[in-house]
Amino acid sequence: MTPGPAPSIIAVLMTEATRIPERSGTAFRLDKGAILEVIDPMGVQVSDLLAFNADDVGEAISSGRTFDYAETIYLTTGHVLYSSRSRPMLEIIADDVGRHDFLLTPCSYDTFRHFYPDKPLHRGCFGNLAEALAPYGVTEDMIPCAFNCFMNVPVNGETGKLEVLPPISKAGDKIVFRAAMDLVIGLTACSAYSSNGGSFKPIDYRIVG
């Protein structure tokens, strides 16, 4: 009987990160109990994250439900991201940055027309997510507000005005989630200028378990 790889080699293979190229996106299944690490490998880069119930993609991540139960718009370690049916989807179990956004929708052609009329049009995170999620039965009209990892959107407490500032994430910073149900995940390396400090970089992710 031929022996298998040494345990240390197996561990390395299980935890190798996958890279999402700049201004693109992907989708994949995440089993209940599995750990998802979203990593900013170069710093100052946003990643839009969507989650859907793998058994019924009509149940999706919900910013409104999450804010209601968390009683804060600044979500970090210990907070849970809830579904449109008030069920836990993802728990944040570690967070190097502590500043993310769950207010703004994925950027799109219309975002670029509105905010960047002098820049080339790009389908943005919305288009990238729509293409990646289509094989799982998710249509464009089913795409909700994303949890924008590393996005820095301060809110003026007096006026309610939003600002989009460069992320405070540094190279190698990550946010780590545990899946509370079987999920379909959509994930991007964001395409919008203001969200990423004016440049576009990749995002890494790693699944453990």
Predicted regions and their residues:
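Acidic, Ser/Thr/Pro
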Residues: 4-209
